[in-house]
């Protein structure tokens, strides 16, 4: 018996990052983590900066970092549209650590003209990238 799958397309502002059949997708939605499997109800929602984990048709997993964006679920296809999409192995861990440190410093030393929203977004994106790196390291250690 063939595994049930759904067509998934992950697209960044620059290019198509992934297109193929998947058995499962997990993303960080605006209201919490979302799991999408074949037969999922139609849905359109914002996604937060975080990890997208897919289980492909052959059972292999792949992990991506998404900067946030839109998730659209239709009966036979799922689309993820994000400004920035990185495969887990493309994440520069040191750059993410530095971005996190920088955002925390800006928030701690905020002046009158401080843009809190921009610093919060930078911090959330850096933390999300570091979580993806940690997840990959845990999977490799198994």
UniProtKB/Swiss-Prot annotation:
Location(s), subcellular: Cell inner membrane
Q: Name one GO cellular component term.
A: proton-transporting ATP synthase complex
Any one GO MF term held by the record is:
proton-transporting ATP synthase activity, rotational mechanism
**Principal cellular location given in the protein's record:** membrane
Membrane topology term: Peripheral membrane protein
| Keywords recorded for this protein, A-Z | ATP synthesis, Cell inner membrane, Cell membrane, CF(1), Hydrogen ion transport, Ion transport, Membrane, Transport
**What InterPro entries has UniProt attached to this entry?**
ATP_F1_dsu/esu_C_sf, ATP_synth_F1_dsu/esu, ATP_synth_F1_dsu/esu_N, ATP_synth_F1_esu_C, ATPsynth_dsu/esu_N
Looking up CDD domains in the UniProt record yields:
F1-ATPase_delta
Assembly and partners are described as:
F-type ATPases have 2 components, CF(1) - the catalytic core - and CF(0) - the membrane proton channel. CF(1) has five subunits: alpha(3), beta(3), gamma(1), delta(1), epsilon(1). CF(0) has three main subunits: a, b and c.
- What role does it play? Produces ATP from ADP in the presence of a proton gradient across the membrane.
Q: Which family does it belong to?
A: Belongs to the ATPase epsilon chain family.
Name the PANTHER family on file. ATP SYNTHASE DELTA/EPSILON CHAIN, ATP SYNTHASE EPSILON CHAIN, CHLOROPLASTIC
Protein name, entry field: ATP synthase epsilon chain
Q: Which organism is it from?
A: Shewanella loihica (strain ATCC BAA-1088 / PV-4)
- Taxon lineage: Bacteria, Pseudomonadati, Pseudomonadota, Gammaproteobacteria, Alteromonadales
């Amino acid at each position: 018996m063939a595994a049930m799958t759904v067509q998934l397309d992950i697209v960044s502002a620059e290019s198509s990052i992934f297109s193929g059949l998947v058995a499962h997708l997990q993303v960080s939605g605006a209201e919490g983590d979302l799991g999408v499997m074949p037969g999922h109800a139609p849905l359109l929602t914002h996604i937060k900066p975080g990890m997208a984990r897919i289980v492909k048709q052959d059972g292999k997993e792949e992990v991506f970092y998404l900067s946030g964006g839109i998730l659209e679920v239709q009966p036979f296809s799922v689309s993820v549209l994000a400004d920035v999409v990185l495969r887990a192995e493309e994440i520069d861990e040191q750059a993410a650590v530095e971005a996190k440190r920088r955002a925390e410093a800006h928030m701690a030393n905020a002046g009158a003209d401080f843009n809190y929203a921009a610093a919060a977004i930078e911090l959330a994106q850096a933390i999300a990238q570091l979580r993806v790196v940690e997840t990959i390291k845990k999977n490799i250690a198994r």
